[in-house]
């Protein structure tokens, strides 16, 4: 009676093995900025049937011929739901020279900057002029190789939904060098001296017990267990949470992470996230200051916000509340500090000084709006805010504080009762610290892709 069962099991197992083996190679999600600072993420091309990338290096002698073929291929598929882009992973690439290259090419496709080479590594690109045809929905690569008839055929099959494996063909062109990968293959980055310091500097303040991060990065074991997720959010630029172009201006509190540090982290994870030989785990030694202490001493006035119950699950609407202030005279705020009741769920908080009958619209305001914005709270922003010298936020007599709360659930029901400490001037400062909103609410039309919105304000 057991033999038929064993026979059926064997057939089912064989079919399962064959079906798994036939799938295209998964590359996972990733993100890059292009020469104009625009953000490109593979999964955001899911409205397209395919994304075609070609490795590019202007110093390669054969690149012009490959580029001509690439443009021809793009023209052939112009009426299809296919996007084309170049990916520059040259070690000499930087924002200035790829902008110059983009202008010289005059092409209608993007030039992506892969300065850390991690995306090119993930796609296993080895030659300039090499193609990678990607399925943005399944996050797989269906073709890698030269620009030839086979590439066009695979792309046509992908559009029809008929691709069930990855086609790999030989590519001609200049070799792409990966010195960081080679170095880290020979000598894996050390956890204690190289990896843990990056995590401590960039991640641990939020990813700690009781923090807003979904898990604590407080030991090698935790880091190793979450390493696939860490790799993914690094390559998609979700973390560290700095979704701004580092090549335009400078944000003093942005947690930019260097290409070198990214390479160390990703290559360490790819090597299995080894602990090394250090006797002490540096992440277990990190001490955080008491977040419930007043950093500037006892405030002149403490505001206790209404208590909010946060459920274990669900998506919560913003909560807008007004808090009456007891001041019987005008006040000027010199500094402010928030102390979150439960920072593991408080995503952000905004506060405005408003007149008795005024409704603070926050982000819903239309057009240019001038407000007495007091200060905001966001994950990682735990220091007291002292306004610039001789400036302060004005609170006229009889005005109130309008506050907006945004909570994110984390699987555990809790409550939040945040407090604010206000530090006042004894005498009015020379200038009022005023906030000007350049734009308010804008509407994205249904099904609109890559919708752009802009606004301007002229200072008189």
Language-model segments: which ranges?
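Aromatic- and Gly/Pro-enriched helix-to-coil junctions and flexible linker segments
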Residues: 168-323, 398-404
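Structural micro-motif
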Residues: 28, 106-110, 124-132, 152, ...
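N-terminal "domain-start" segment that seeds a small globular fold
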Residues: 21-43, 55, 174, 179, ...
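Beta-strand-centric surfaces of beta-sandwich/beta-rich domains
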Residues: 241, 246-251, 280-460
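Structural microenvironment flanking redox-active thiols in thiol-disulfide oxidoreductases
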Residues: 64-105, 113-122
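Bacterial N-terminal signal peptides
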Residues: 8-18
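Thiol/selenol-based redox catalytic cores and closely related redox-interacting motifs
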Residues: 114-177
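Short active-site neighborhood of thiol/selenol oxidoreductases, capturing the structured segment around
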Residues: 43-64
């Amino acid at each position: 009676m057991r033999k038929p069962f064993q026979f059926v099991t064997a057939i089912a197992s064989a079919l399962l093995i064959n079906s798994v083996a036939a799938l295209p190679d998964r590359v996972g999600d990733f993100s890059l900025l292009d020469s104009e600072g625009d953000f490109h993420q593979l999964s955001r091309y899911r409205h397209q049937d395919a994304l075609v990338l070609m490795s590019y290096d202007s110093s390669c002698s054969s690149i012009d011929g490959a580029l001509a073929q690439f443009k021809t291929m793009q023209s052939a598929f112009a009426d299809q739901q296919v996007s084309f882009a170049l990916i520059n992973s040259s070690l000499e690439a930087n924002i200035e020279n790829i902008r110059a290259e983009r202008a010289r090419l005059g092409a209608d496709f993007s030039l992506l900057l892969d300065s850390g080479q991690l995306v090119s590594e993930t796609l296993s690109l080895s030659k300039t002029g090499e193609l990678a045809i990607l399925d943005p929905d399944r996050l797989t690569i269906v073709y890698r190789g030269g620009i030839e008839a086979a590439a066009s055929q695979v792309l046509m099959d992908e559009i029809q939904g008929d691709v069930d494996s990855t086609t790999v063909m030989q590519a001609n062109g200049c070799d792409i060098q990966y010195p960081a990968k080679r170095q880290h293959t020979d000598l894996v980055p050390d956890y204690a001296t190289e990896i843990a310091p990056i995590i401590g500097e960039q991640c641990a303040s939020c990813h700690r017990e009781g923090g807003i991060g979904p898990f604590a990065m407080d030991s090698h074991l935790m880091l190793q267990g979450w390493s696939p997720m860490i790799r993914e959010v690094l390559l998609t630029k979700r973390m560290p949470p700095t979704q701004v172009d580092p090549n335009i201006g400078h944000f003093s509190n942005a947690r930019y992470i260097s290409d070198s540090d990214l390479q160390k982290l990703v290559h360490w994870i790819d090597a299995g996230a080894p602990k090394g030989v250090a006797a002490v785990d540096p992440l277990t030694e990190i001490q955080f200051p008491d977040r419930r202490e007043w950093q500037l001493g006892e405030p002149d006035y403490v505001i206790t916000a209404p208590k909010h119950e946060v459920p274990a699950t669900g998506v919560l609407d913003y909560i807008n509340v007004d808090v009456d202030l007891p001041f019987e005279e005008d006040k000027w705020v010199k500094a402010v500090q928030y102390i979150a009741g439960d920072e593991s769920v408080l995503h952000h908080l905004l506060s405005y000084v408003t007149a008795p009958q005024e409704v603070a619209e926050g982000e819903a305001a239309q057009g240019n709006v001038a407000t007495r914005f007091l200060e905001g709270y966001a994950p990682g922003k735990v220091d007291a805010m002292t306004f610039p010298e001789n400036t302060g936020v004005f609170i006229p007599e009889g005005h109130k504080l309008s506050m907006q709360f945004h909570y994110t659930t984390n699987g555990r029901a809790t409550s939040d009762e945040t407090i604010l400490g206000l530090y006042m001037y004894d005498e009015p400062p020379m200038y009022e610290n005023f906030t000007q909103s350049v734009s308010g609410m804008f509407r994205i039309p249904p099904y609109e892709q890559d919708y752009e919105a802009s606004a301007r304000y002229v200072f008189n």
